[in-house]
């Protein structure tokens, strides 16, 4: 896809969202069902995955780890956003790899140490980009990718999660 094709695809949506802001609000959903043992089956809309305990918390390693899925979601969203921004700005990118890493102290989730944080202490997002573009353009590409990546922004902001029982 080139910049003109992307613009043709997105311009009608942008126009609609400018005139009808409520149309831009879309509720994304996920559904999971508690599985056998200590697992949970997730319906992604495209496939079915089974999440389970990470080996560092007693899991057997046969199920996907929710923490890994979070990092995968960040890598996927950052990659799609990177490509969209590169396309829209005419950035010449031959190839790109997106890497995510996160540090977890499992003492927190296992309640071994009440001072240990439950959740990622730090998440790192790295881009390996093959391009002839100057560093200034690469820096701008990354800045725009961070700005428009939904998962990046969600993780980087404090968001309220409303929990309920139905």
Language model region names:
Residues 73-78:
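Alpha-helical metal-binding/catalytic segments enriched in His/Glu/Asp
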């Amino acid at each position: 896809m080139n910049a003109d094709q992307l613009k043709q695809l997105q311009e009608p949506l942008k126009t609609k969202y400018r005139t009808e802001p409520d149309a831009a609000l879309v509720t994304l959903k996920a559904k999971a069902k508690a599985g056998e043992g200590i697992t949970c089956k997730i319906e992604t809309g495209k496939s079915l995955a089974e999440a389970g305990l990470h080996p560092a918390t007693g899991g057997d390693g046969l199920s996907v780890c929710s923490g890994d899925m979070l990092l995968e979601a960040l890598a996927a969203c950052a990659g799609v956003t990177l490509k969209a921004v590169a396309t829209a700005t005419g950035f010449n990118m031959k190839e790109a790899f997106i890497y995510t890493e996160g540090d977890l102290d499992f003492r927190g989730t296992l309640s071994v140490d009440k001072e240990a944080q439950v959740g990622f202490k730090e998440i790192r997002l790295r881009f390996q980009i093959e391009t002839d573009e100057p560093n200034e353009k690469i820096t701008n590409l990354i800045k725009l990718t961070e700005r428009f990546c939904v998962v990046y922004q969600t993780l980087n902001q404090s968001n309220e999660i409303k929990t309920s029982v139905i």
